[in-house]
Amino acid sequence: ERQAGMMHRTTMPKNEGMLFVFPRPHQTGFWMKNTTLPLSIAYIDRASRVIEIYDLHPLNTQPVESRSARVQYALEVNQGWFAKNGIQPGTVLATELGSLAVSVRAK
């Protein structure tokens, strides 16, 4: 699923996204090959803190690399969703279950 991501999808619900969970923190990159939806991506550390946010442009095959090697999660959402919801680098994300780490373990 990591490799396919949002490829070939034509819609994504307004307040949904795709969370990628990595086995350990590292530097990573995402591209938009075969992806026609404009997306934004947040690179997130193991403490659920947003490190970096980027806009991803449809069909762009150049990877958008993280600058940090502390990326534990990546969250893809509709482009502009982070800004509309006041999420920026430094924001700590959580779900109804708690931190991203707690939420992922609960699944």
What are these regions (language model features)?
Residues 1-107:
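Compact, glycine-rich, soluble single-domain proteins
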